[in-house]
Amino acid sequence: LTGNVYSPEGKPLADGYTIINKGGVKIGVIGMVTPNITRWDAKNLTGWTVTNPVDESRKIIDQIKGKVDVIVGVMHMDIDNEYGVYGSGVTDLANACPEFDVIVAAHGHKSIPNKMINGVLVVENKNAGATLSEIHVYLERGLNGKWKVKNRTSENLNMKDYAPDPTLTALLASYDERAKADAVTPIGQLVGGDLAPANEIDCLPQAMIQDTALLDFINEVQMYYTDAQV
């Protein structure tokens, strides 16, 4: 999903697209990431160039549209733009590139089972694998022998209703254990009492209604690592 990210040498971090052949149907899959990663990961992107997903997708579509039957966008971008940056949301992408049959959005961490934007079917899922989109693309073969998309439907499935896939679980086991071990690694020790006082009202954290040492600590850490002058 980094077809619009280029190294300091001008080489793409990954191919912007791939073509999958399923049962004689050629599916072009285009992957991009929001250009706003330059805001959040600036230190890790020194010298790298992140281009606009709309421009990159347009170039790829013009290159492959005569070679594929279905065009799918897989984008780490929300529905709407962020920070007023054109092309950072898939709405701009669908409006500029109506050749997309389906766009799978992300980043917004919300469930959008089926939204039509400029004739493009757009879906998005919740974070942490809570939902999964099931998309059906219906095609019809024309007299010239070529496939043509006739309809698209989709729904978001709640993964809590399904048993984990044992094969995928086994493949991810080592990463899962590493993440769990990292999550419980001690990074410090608190002595002398709690950083937040006891709740005065049940179910209402005291930190939400008064200044606390906990919030002061969080803010100090944020300022330290961002060099903020507040």
Feature roles, as predicted:
Residues 1-161, 167, 209, 214-221:
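Acidic, metal/ion-coordinating pockets
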Residues 65-66, 144, 159-230:
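Non-catalytic terminal accessory segments
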